[in-house]
């Protein structure tokens, strides 16, 4: 409810009645709903989400080029003033970001797949390392390190994100569970007729999926 507090503090009758309020939270439907239900001046609120960050937080982790050529999602809503939307867009452009417009629900469905579930998967895999012998961990290559890098993220932040975007995450996780069940069933009987073909199909589907990702941060491959 920080957006509601900001709106009540700055606009329309606070110290800065002409202020535009935005947020950079990782979930957009919940803040928008809170603003609309609060009775605050929703016309000056425009949700946004710069798709940039690191697994570390705080001033020490700051980078001057953090937003350069990164997507910045702006979630316009029916009550938002046009000039407020333009101001938030101008902020993103000034910081070097590439602006994308989505509704709050489109945003949350999208980031569930491209950000929130990857965080969950990385953390789950890293969990398996807790009791792994040190000699085995010393052999870990870049593949494992890349996969679990974001498992070092702040749990306090991600607990809030997961809880706020639970429904879209669950839909994606159910699909992943079906794929995992399929893989497990095949590996439990790897010499069965068609088992190798099924494994190849799973890998091919992964190849097809990763090939659809554009170049880094939305730029040309």
Please describe what each predicted stretch is.
Residues 1:
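Short, structured active-site "lid" loops
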Residues 5-60:
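Rossmann-like NAD(P)(H) cofactor-binding subdomain of soluble oxidoreductases
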Residues 60-66, 160:
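Short, flexible, solvent-exposed loop/turn segments with mixed acidic/basic and small polar residues
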Residues 64-152:
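Internal alpha-helical scaffold of NAD(P)-dependent oxidoreductase catalytic cores
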Residues 135-207:
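Interdomain hinge/lid region at the active-site interface
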Residues 200-221:
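Short, amphipathic C-terminal "tail helix"
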């Amino acid at each position: 409810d920080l957006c509601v507090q900001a709106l009540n503090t700055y606009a329309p009758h606070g110290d800065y009645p002409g202020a535009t309020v935005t947020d950079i939270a990782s979930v957009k439907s919940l803040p928008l709903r809170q603003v609309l239900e609060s009775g605050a001046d929703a016309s000056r609120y425009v949700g946004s989400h710069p798709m940039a960050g690191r697994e570390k937080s705080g001033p020490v982790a700051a980078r001057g080029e953090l937003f350069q050529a990164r997507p910045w999602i702006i979630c316009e809503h029916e009550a938002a003033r046009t000039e407020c939307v333009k101001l938030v867009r101008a902020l993103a452009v000034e910081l070097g970001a590439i602006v994308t417009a989505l509704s709050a629900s489109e945003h949350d469905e999208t980031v569930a797949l491209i950000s929130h579930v990857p965080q969950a998967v990385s953390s789950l895999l890293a969990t398996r390392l807790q009791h792994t012998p040190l000699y085995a961990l010393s052999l870990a290559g870049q593949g494992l390190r890349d996969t679990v890098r974001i498992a070092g993220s702040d749990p306090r932040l991600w607990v809030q994100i997961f809880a706020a975007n639970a429904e879209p995450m669950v839909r994606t996780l159910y699909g992943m569970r079906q794929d995992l069940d399929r893989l497990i069933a095949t590996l439990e009987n790897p010499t069965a007729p068609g088992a190798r073909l099924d494994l190849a199909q799973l890998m091919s589907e992964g190849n097809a999926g990763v090939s659809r990702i554009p170049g880094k941060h939305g730029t040309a491959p």
